[in-house]
């Protein structure tokens, strides 16, 4: 059903730096701060005539907070590189049509109301299975230069995204045929297929609306200057950017919510060393640190002037990706992996790993065991938790024809499905360097556990840019040059449909079409996922739980445990609320200071 026209493929190596930051909280920065140029001039802002000189009350003291991040954001356009730090500053300055609150409820931004079937804003053609979504925009939102935000800005943003030369794939954009402005405050999105994620498609964590009168369409969505010198619709304006040191944001006088933001100034300071940032937080020199790691949380738990906000559920799940195609191949049917193509081996690997032990010992108990994709609201499925049972794991390997007949402690193929007789059960367990020491320690423990059941496991650590680069660039996963990889992944928001497509749909196993890097092909799963593109929530729940059973039986990906989703902040700062649906600054306009 779903065929992605992903002209972003050429940019995949850049886009997938996402995992260096967004695949969980990384203890160390993925790379040195991005080499960028600070804006030569700030964007034009609306001017206000001075008031007549009269006796005025003494002004209130200017309030200011400091947010620490390890590297400069590449830009304010989080759709491009998605390092997390771009989304953090984007939330300070720019709005989309709608976002999500921590409970998963739609939070209107530029939109005046949420279009639904009940209010007539969503119209579905039951025969063609297409839909039209009509958005009504607020009439009181202006760009920071005083220009009203209109439906033309929404059309402009869409056309910039889908430009075949300078555009970028974003989730669900392949379902959109066109976007039309009916008037200044009404825009219609025409879908070629029912798309359940429409509510936050032009909003959420990664996408905002851009100004048609200010951004240069010739420069293109990925590279335009307005991505680094933005006009603001959000609560703050960019006042200064000293690359490698800090960014200064001040209140947006045109912000449409009266009395907000509650803090006059936000300074985003670049602090590459997380231990330095932790000390600054404890000493009161930093007010917010996004993505606090498990060791940092342990160190901060007794600090009297620091509080921790932890999301109610988890987003990032550490997982193993077993390649079902022979190493260097992308065809699991013609060239099955000699070891991992047998589901009994994949099941044995899961049984051999002590998830609780690793989570407690390495990740300080903050992570929780996860064994199904449907572990977080609103879609929960009852899948029994697998046991940690090395003896059962060894028995499965025996059954699969992997035995140790030469007595060296490592198994060889004796009647196995896909390897030659006598071939050793030897494979490589690979992870990425940027996560840091904790993940490498976890990798070592997993290697030891697999060795104990007779698997000869070699460990390797590579740069994420090598692991996740696109096919043309020789990305190890896209070209299939790996055995068993370890990294963390997850999705924002409340709709897992696109995430499931990218990770498990058969078409996504093709190079650069998605992240079905295990090359798992299952027509039954594909059919269920096709059916899930509906607005019938009860039916979607039923479909997802059927998918959960297939994933449990086939184990194309082995889920292990969640990593913590938490942010640390000073006790004087009120209103910080961590969420799996967005970055910590999602509600920055509501933050206040209590001295």
What does each model-identified segment do?
Residues 72-73, 140-142, 194-195:
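Acidic glycine-/aspartate-rich tracts in secreted/extracellular proteins
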Residues 68-125, 231-233:
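N-terminal lobe/hinge region of extracytoplasmic solute-binding protein
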Residues 66, 107, 132-134, 186-188, ...:
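General beta-strand recognition
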Residues 1-5:
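N-terminal secretory signal peptides that target proteins for export/translocation
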Residues 560:
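Active-site-proximal polar cores
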Residues 7, 11, 15, 19-59, ...:
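Extracytoplasmic/periplasmic ligand-capture domains
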Residues 170-218, 242:
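Surface-exposed binding/hinge segments that line
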Residues 71, 433-435, 564:
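Residue-level signal for short, function-critical loop segments
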């Amino acid at each position: 059903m779903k065929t992605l026209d992903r002209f972003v493929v050429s940019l995949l190596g850049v886009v997938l730096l996402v995992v260096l930051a967004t695949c969980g909280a990384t203890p160390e920065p993925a790379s040195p701060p991005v080499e960028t140029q600070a804006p030569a001039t700030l964007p034009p802002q609306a001017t206000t005539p001075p008031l007549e000189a009269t006796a005025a009350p003494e002004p209130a003291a200017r309030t200011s907070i400091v947010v620490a991040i390890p590297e400069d954001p590449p830009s304010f356009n989080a759709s491009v590189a998605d390092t997390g730090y771009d989304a953090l500053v984007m939330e300070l300055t720019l709005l989309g049509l709608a976002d999500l609150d921590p409970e998963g409820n739609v939070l209107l931004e530029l939109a005046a109301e949420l279009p639904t079937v009940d209010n007539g804003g969503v119209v579905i053609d039951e025969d063609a299975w297409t839909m039209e979504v009509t958005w009504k925009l607020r009439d009181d939102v202006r760009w920071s230069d005083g220009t009203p935000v209109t439906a033309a800005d929404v059309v402009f943003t869409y056309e910039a995204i889908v430009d075949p030369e300078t555009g970028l794939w974003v989730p669900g954009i392949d379902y959109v045929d066109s976007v039309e402005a009916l008037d200044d405050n009404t825009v219609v999105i025409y879908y070629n297929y029912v798309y359940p994620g429409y509510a936050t498609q032009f909003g959420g964590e990664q996408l905002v609306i851009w100004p048609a009168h200010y951004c240069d369409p010739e420069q293109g969505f990925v590279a335009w200057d307005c991505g680094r010198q933005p006009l603001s619709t959000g609560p703050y304006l960019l006042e200064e950017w000293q690359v490698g040191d800090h960014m200064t944001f001040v209140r947006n006088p045109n912000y449409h919510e009266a009395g907000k933001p509650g803090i006059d100034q936000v300074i985003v300071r670049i602090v590459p060393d997380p231990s330095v940032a932790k000390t600054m937080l404890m000493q009161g020199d930093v007010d917010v640190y996004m993505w606090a790691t498990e060791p940092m949380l342990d160190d901060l738990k007794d600090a009297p002037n620091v509080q921790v906000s932890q999301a109610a559920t988890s987003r990032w799940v550490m997982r193993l990706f077993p390649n079902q195609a022979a190493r260097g191949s992308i065809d699991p049917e013609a060239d099955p992996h000699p070891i991992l193509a047998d589901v009994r081996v994949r099941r044995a690997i899961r049984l051999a790993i002590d998830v609780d032990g690793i989570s407690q010992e390495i990740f300080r108990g903050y992570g929780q065991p996860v064994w199904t994709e449907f572990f977080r609201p609103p879609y929960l499925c009852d899948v029994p938790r697998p046991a940690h049972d090395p003896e059962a794991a060894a028995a499965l390997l025996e059954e699969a024809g992997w035995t140790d007949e030469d007595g060296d402690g490592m198994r060889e193929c004796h009647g196995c499905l896909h390897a030659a007789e006598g071939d050793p059960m030897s494979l490589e367990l690979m992870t990425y360097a940027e996560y840091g020491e904790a993940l490498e320690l976890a990798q070592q423990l997993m290697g030891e556990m697999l060795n104990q059941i007779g698997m000869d496991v070699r460990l390797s650590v590579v740069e994420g840019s090598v692991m996740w680069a696109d096919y043309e660039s020789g990305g190890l996963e896209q070209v299939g040059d790996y055995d068993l990889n370890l990294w963390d992944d997850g999705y924002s928001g409340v709709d897992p449909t696109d995430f499931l497509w990218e990770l498990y749909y058969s078409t996504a196993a093709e190079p650069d079409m998605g992240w079905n890097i295990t090359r798992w092909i299952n027509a039954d799963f594909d059919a269920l996922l096709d059916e899930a593109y509906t607005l019938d929530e009860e039916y979607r729940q039923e479909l997802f739980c059927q998918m959960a059973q297939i994933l449990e039986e086939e184990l194309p990906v082995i889920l292990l445990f969640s990593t913590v989703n938490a942010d640390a902040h000073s006790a004087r700062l009120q209103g910080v609320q961590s969420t799996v649906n967005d970055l910590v600054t999602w509600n920055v306009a509501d933050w206040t200071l209590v001295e």
